[in-house]
């Protein structure tokens, strides 16, 4: 009788790499020796045998992968192992990612099923994997595969099969293909080359059956996939002729089946700029082997047209059975200067027109927009916030008056200290020329009214173009132009953050200033700057006036002539910058865009910005902190009204690429841009653009 021997069967549970058969990979490069304490990691464990004799040793390979930064050394041990089974603690040195652990099984281990927990620890981070262990009965034979290894094996031709039988001599050994005998090999170690070329494509289960004294001992099964079908490219992204690709996007190619990662090289994919210059890149294959990702080493340049050429993949990249790709595509996509945030935005279905859009970026870096739009009977104010994937409407349509036919228009937005949007607008009262102003604050679920703003409204008196900013101490500052039928002037109020009523700021009215019209307000620190267009009787011209804290006319004079719509912003040194349209007759045809800034004791010389466009209108300024300032406006270039954008670089306004238009067809004019800086100091722009049926809001961000 042979000595009492036990059978040990181990298999990995929950370790998917141990159950996926791909060709063995060469050792990857060692990790950067610079380590991060408590770095996160994962590991896989693969036993070298599935059965082992008692008193013997089971070798188990482990492979380490750092989640992000590389960590230090990793110590391995078994957690509370059963009696007779032990692993001497082993430390994987810093910088290494592979090791072979030796698990000893004592000769006296009691037969039965056990659960082992293998643990790796680096710093304070521990990860575990579970192994099942079965100790067999005395007298059992040990049957182990050598090749194929655990998991799935792929073949398109001859396949080498090798295995061992230990623990005594077998009277008969058979290789089973599913339930039938494939061959009865002899000799030890046992070896057989299976020619699969005559087999039908499909999946087969192979196992080894050894017989002795009427007892049958069977190996663990091996899954063999016979595959002679060439893989194909199922899909790819970005799509052919895609027009809105981000500078950080990768190219993803999906195949019809898993590919051999060892057949994939960086040279297999061609990636070039529009000028034909090769783009440095890296390539990787997904864990399931079906997705090839091409990642440029640096962000793509914008604007540009990128070419992707996969023809080198043909016959070079193969599936796990060795079948090569027979055809592969080439295509192009465009990386524009600007990317849309969602598509066209409209609150009302049908042939409606959105107007007066205003954009602000909240304290979490998310754009918020407000605009006016008619539902066919009443024009309301709408507010929406970008979620990161879509525009979410904030509450119901806003109107200060309930009566049918009211007309809400010209909203403005501010974001308060609690990151809540506050919106103001003017609205027709239905009493002659009368218009009133209204203010609402978003609570997170609904809109609440702010205290009444004490402006007179009658059949001939009304307020227009309300402006709202958040100043020092998180106070709200409101300004508008008040018209009385004969004249108009700037009015201003403050709502303290802890107050319940608006305080009249009584803005100064310089002598000879008549008929104030377009208005823009900006805040910085303790300063509030109010810019407005006004007829300057002393200079006999309509110019731009800028008030500092509602109390003094900066520079003692107005700027420009024939001034119309304008925009003001404040830089980090609390200097106001102002841009305005000069138009002798009609801005939509003869408007010219100018700018100036305050230089401590006087204004810089007003300078023309719109050198390459006509019919300029609706400027919008946004000043960066550590990033270039931005000026956007609506103008006509190449016979199309678009949004033009310039950036302050090297002490001058320089165009940021080509004019922007959301619609590709001609005859789709873009109006009224509103620009703000995002959390990274980069511009986000909203405007309205019309086609033959309606006008919608569009929002774009810089592609950076």
Protein language model annotation of sequence segments:
Residues 20-139:
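Long beta-sheet-rich domains in secretory-pathway and surface-associated proteins
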Residues 31-36, 41-49, 137-154, 227-245:
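Short, compositionally biased P/S/T/A/G/V-rich stretches that sit at domain boundaries
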Residues 79-89, 179-183, 241, 269, ...:
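Short, solvent-exposed loop/linker segments at beta-strand-coil boundaries, enriched for Pro/Gly
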Residues 93, 98, 138-228, 309:
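Long, low-complexity serine/threonine/glycine- and acidic-rich segments characteristic of extracellular
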Residues 104-111, 195-199, 299-301:
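Short, surface-exposed loop/turn segments at beta-strand-coil junctions that are enriched for proline
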Residues 134-138, 195, 222-231, 331-337, ...:
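Flexible, low-complexity linkers/stalks enriched in Thr/Pro that connect modular domains
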Residues 163, 336-704:
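Extracellular, repeat-based ectodomains that mediate carbohydrate processing or recognition
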Residues 247-284, 313-318:
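Short, surface-exposed alpha-helix to beta-strand junction/turn motifs within ectodomains of secreted
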């Amino acid at each position: 009788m042979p000595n009492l021997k036990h059978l040990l069967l181990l298999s990995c549970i929950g370790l998917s790499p141990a159950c996926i058969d791909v060709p063995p990979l060469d050792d990857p490069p060692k990790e950067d020796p610079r380590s991060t304490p408590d770095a996160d990691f994962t590991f896989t464990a693969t036993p070298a045998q599935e059965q082992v004799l008692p008193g013997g040793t089971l070798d188990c390979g482990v492979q380490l992968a750092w989640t992000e930064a590389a960590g230090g050394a990793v110590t391995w041990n078994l957690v509370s192992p059963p009696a007779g089974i032990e692993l001497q603690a082993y430390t994987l040195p810093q910088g290494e990612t592979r090791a072979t652990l030796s698990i000893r099984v004592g000769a006296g281990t009691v037969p039965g099923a056990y659960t082992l927990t293998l643990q790796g620890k680096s710093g304070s981070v521990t990860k575990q994997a579970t192994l099942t262990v079965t100790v067999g009965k005395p007298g059992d034979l040990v049957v182990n595969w050598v090749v194929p290894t655990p998991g799935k094996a792929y073949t398109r031709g001859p396949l080498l099969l090798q295995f061992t039988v230990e623990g005594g001599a077998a009277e008969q050994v058979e290789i089973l293909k599913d339930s039938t005998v494939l061959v009865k090999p002899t000799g030890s170690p046992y070896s057989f080359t299976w020619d699969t070329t005559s087999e039908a494509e499909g999946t087969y289960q192979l196992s080894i059956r050894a017989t002795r004294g009427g007892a049958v001992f069977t190996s663990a099964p091996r899954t063999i996939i016979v595959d002679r079908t060439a893989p194909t490219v199922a899909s790819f992204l970005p799509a052919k002729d895609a027009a809105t690709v981000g500078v950080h996007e990768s190219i993803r190619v999906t195949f019809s089946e898993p590919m051999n990662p060892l057949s994939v090289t960086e040279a297999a994919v061609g990636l070039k700029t529009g000028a034909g210059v090769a783009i440095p890149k890296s390539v990787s294959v997904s864990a399931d082997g079906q997705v090839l990702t091409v990642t440029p080493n640096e962000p793509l340049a914008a604007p540009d047209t990128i070419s992707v050429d996969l023809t080198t993949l043909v016959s070079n990249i193969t599936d796990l059975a060795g079948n090569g790709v027979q055809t592969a595509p080439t295509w192009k996509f465009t990386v524009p200067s600007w990317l849309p945030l969602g598509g066209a935005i409209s609150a009302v279905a049908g042939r409606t027109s959105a107007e007066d859009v205003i954009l602000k970026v909240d304290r979490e870096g998310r754009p918020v927009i407000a605009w006016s739009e008619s539902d066919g009977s009443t024009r309301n104010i709408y507010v929406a916030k970008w979620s990161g994937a879509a525009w979410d409407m904030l509450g119901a349509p806003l109107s200060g008056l309930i009566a049918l036919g009211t007309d809400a228009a010209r909203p403005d937005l501010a974001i308060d200290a609690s990151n809540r949007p506050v919106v103001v607008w003017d609205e027709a009262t239905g009493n002659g020329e009368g218009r009133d102003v209204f203010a609402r604050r978003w609570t997170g679920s609904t809109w609440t009214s702010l205290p009444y703003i004490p402006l007179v409204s009658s059949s001939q008196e009304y307020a227009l173009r309300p402006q709202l900013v958040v100043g020092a101490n998180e106070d709200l500052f409101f300004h508008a132009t008040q018209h009385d039928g004969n004249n108009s002037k700037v009015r201003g109020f403050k709502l303290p953050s802890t107050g319940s009523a608006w305080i009249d700021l009584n803005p100064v009215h310089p002598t000879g200033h008549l008929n104030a019209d377009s208005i823009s307000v900006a805040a910085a620190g303790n300063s509030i700057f109010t810019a407005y267009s006004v007829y300057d009787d002393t200079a006999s011209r309509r110019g731009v006036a800028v008030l500092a804290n509602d109390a003094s006319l900066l520079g003692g004079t107005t700027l420009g002539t024939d001034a119309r719509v304008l925009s003001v912003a404040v830089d980090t040194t609390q200097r106001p910058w102002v841009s305005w349209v000069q138009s002798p007759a009609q801005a939509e045809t003869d408007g010219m865009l100018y700018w100036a800034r305050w230089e401590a004791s006087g204004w810089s010389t007003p300078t023309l910005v719109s050198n390459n466009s006509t019919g300029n209108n609706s400027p919008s300024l946004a000043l960066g902190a550590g990033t270039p300032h931005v000026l956007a406006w609506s103008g006509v270039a190449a016979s199309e009204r678009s949004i033009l954008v310039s950036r302050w670089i090297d002490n001058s306004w320089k165009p940021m690429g080509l004019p922007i238009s959301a619609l590709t067809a001609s005859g789709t004019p873009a109006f009224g841009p509103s620009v703000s800086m995002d959390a990274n100091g980069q511009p986000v722009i909203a405007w309205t653009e019309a086609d033959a049926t309606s006008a919608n809001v569009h929002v774009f961000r810089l592609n950076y």
